[in-house]
Swiss-Prot record:
Keywords: Cytoplasm, GTP-binding, Hydrolase, Metal-binding, Nucleotide-binding, Ribosome biogenesis, RNA-binding, rRNA-binding, Zinc. Its cofactor is Zn(2+). One of its GO terms (biological process) is ribosomal small subunit biogenesis. Signal peptide: none annotated. Pfam families: RsgA_GTPase. HAMAP family: GTPase_RsgA (MF_01820). The keyword Acyltransferase does not apply. CDD domains: YjeQ_EngC (cd01854). Binds 1 zinc ion per subunit. This is Small ribosomal subunit biogenesis GTPase RsgA.
Length: 302
């Protein structure tokens, strides 16, 4: 039977059986414990489960199409990064870091959700509307979470998917969750625990049934650290992709290298909105590794 691992507690694995639509406890077959060359089961894995006697055994792990280390989860279909426009103010540098990180981790659908749009003044809304157009030009789907039509579109987008929700506390994640799947209110205790984990338990990951699929929550922006190399960052900005292949050097970082197609595109105004942020991010890299701590940043859109 095919199943998905939804939780790991100590050595106990809890899986969702797709056909029966039930959740049961399973034990990994010994090969996963004793063979260092075998994948180790993790939350999000699609697995094969066999009932032997009274025990469900995990006998096979299907190939992963992506995975994160923190939170430790595999096979994410969609990441929705929720950022507020005000209270707290929108931080575009942090947003761009996270977009780059998830792109680098082979997550194909990275969405942007803007909350508290209705609290912005007209001047700020004009700035935000221009920003939305810029991100859409770079093939990012942007949803204004206070607009009912955008919520309907988002519901359709995430249906039957494994959704990873990222965002700092106070940006409206719990409100959004209730909008996307009102039935979640029937599991109040579960979702409350899910969204309010202490700082020492942020590496513990759990999937819950959500919108005919699954939901995994990440720690807030200020708590989540991710490492990227300079080359990973250079390849993670999707608006660079059409130009980077024309750079003279295959490992071009698009900073001071000669015959850099990205710098040429910037000079010709073909890339206009994120290159400055890219340079700021690259300059932060100590010893070729970026540790993202977004609370250290203070760039706001006003």
């Amino acid at each position: 039977m095919r199943a998905k691992i939804i939780s790991v507690v100590a050595n106990n694995f809890y899986v969702h059986l797709y056909d029966l639509k039930i959740q049961i406890k399973a034990i990994p077959k010994g090969i996963f414990k004793h063979n260092s060359h075998e994948l180790k089961p993790m939350v999000g894995d699609d697995v094969e489960v066999e009932l032997i006697g009274n025990t469900y055994l995990i006998t096979k792990i299907y190939e992963r199409y992506n995975q994160l280390i923190r939170p430790k989860v595999a096979n994410i279909d969609i990441v929705l990064i929720v950022v507020s426009i005000v209270q707290p103010d929108l931080n575009t540098l942090s947003l761009n870091k996270y977009l780059a990180f998830y792109e680098a981790r082979n997550i194909k659908n990275v969405l942007i959700g803007l909350s508290k749009y209705d609290l912005a003044n007209n001047h700020l809304k004009q700035k935000i509307n221009k920003l939305i157009l810029d991100y859409k030009k770079n093939n990012y789907a942007v949803f204004i979470l206070t607009k009912e039509n955008d919520i309907l579109l988002l519901k359709e987008k995430i249906k039957s998917k494994t959704l990873c929700l990222a965002g700092n506390s106070g940006v409206g994640k719990s409100t959004l969750i209730n909008k996307l799947d009102p039935s979640i209110q029937q599991r109040t205790q579960e979702i409350s625990h899910f969204l309010n984990r202490g700082k020492h338990t942020t590496t513990s990951t759990k999937l819950i049934s959500f919108a005919n699929g699954f939901l995994v929550d990440t720690p807030g922006f200020g708590n989540l650290e991710v490492n990227l190399t300079k080359n990973e960052m250079a390849n993670a900005f999707n608006d660079f992709a059409n130009y980077a292949r024309f750079c003279k050097f295959s490992n071009c970082l698009h900073i001071e290298e000669p015959e850099c197609a990205i710098k040429k595109a910037v000079d010709e105004k073909l890339i206009v909105n994120r290159y400055d942020d890219y340079l700021k991010i690259i300059k932060e890299l100590p010893n070729d590794v970026l540790k993202i701590k977004t609370r250290a940043q203070n760039r706001k859109c006003k």
